[in-house]
Amino acid sequence: MELRQLKYFAKLAETLNFSLASRELFITQSTLSHQILQLENELGQPLFLRNSHEVILTEAGQTLLPLAMETLHSAENCLLRLDELKNVMRGDLRIGVTFSFASIMAETLTAFLRCYPNVKVNVSQSTMADLMERLVRHELDFVLAFKPTASDPRIESRVLFNHHLAAIVNEHHGLASHDSITLEELQRYDLALPRRGTQARSAFDRLVTGTHYQYKVKVEMNTVYLLFRLARESNYVTLLSESTVVGEQGLKAVPIVDAQNHTDVMQGCIHLIRNTYVKNSAKEFIRMLGDSHSILRNSL
């Protein structure tokens, strides 16, 4: 069994399509078929069920897949460590970031690329659940996101800053001149809220638990970009972490008094796989992020 065969197997298991997998591997379809068949012969059992319509992983294939991914990840780390013995900063750096943290990371990304032009940075922006799943599968080197309410023993979360919930409005909104607002006062305004399950919405729901306030929730969505646009172009008030408006023109974060006095904070974190090797480029990016103005001015 060779690493090359495991790489081919993993790609086919991902795509379940010989034609697509061979294109992404830059090999011919016949080469891929031959290598998969050779691997199956070595193992003495089929890894895929094939017919004219589809390709399906067998039970043996499902068992092999996580082991193959772990082996490929270990081999990649071995090469990285040898490269880093030569003090060479290169290779790929794969970062996951939730929508709320994109603007915070932008400053560090620009500085990092300027300092280390030989490192190829791949940034994936998605939901926390998707990014955490990809982190566990070793598809990402680290994730920048809020600390989830339920912890995963496989993931280490390093706190960068603590934040509270705030009312986000456009700079011409009547609230923009206020130093703060209460949960009671929020009842007067039309709200555009993040959907349930997001960190900001969970923080808001915890704040209002046990109260009898009636809010005018007009819109719910899970896209920060659209919430920003709605806030900029209308008098809707949205509720997000204070950090989300860093670098955003035309928006103002108004602290919610009840949130400032509440012990339940939203913790911005770097998430990594626990007890695993962290490549030098990831360590350096994390260091630069911690020292960035975006983080320092948003730290308590």
Predicted regions and their residues:
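N-terminal winged-helix
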Residues: 29-30, 34, 80, 86-116, ...
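A short LG(V/I)-centered, amphipathic sequence patch enriched
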Residues: 40-59
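Short helix-boundary/capping micro-motifs
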Residues: 10-28
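Hydrophobic hinge/microswitch elements
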Residues: 127-139, 146, 199-255
